[in-house]
Amino acid sequence: MLAEDNTTIKTYDQDVWAKMPDMTLPLAPSLQIIEGLHVRWTNLLSALPEDAWSRKATHPERGQVSMDDMLEIYSDHGHNHAKQITDLRARKGW
């Protein structure tokens, strides 16, 4: 979306992804990946010129979305995962 005009965003089957062989690894490597991505994205997104936020891509489930929309979607997605983890911890007494 930042490197290509009007690109199509590729989706994937989350259930299949969750069953990949690396699901048995400790949590730490996955958290390190997420932390690294967030460091890179913070650097990239904070340096974007204003006009980049209106760049468009096609999302198979949402239709046309802007860079601004995608940041909101990703942020909401992360908050939802954090809530799921918090709720699971409360249910399990962790």
Regions found by a protein language model. Give the residues of each.
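Acidic/histidine-rich alpha-helical segments that form the ligand environment
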Residues: 14-54, 74
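Short, contiguous alpha-helical
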Residues: 1-17, 42, 56-94
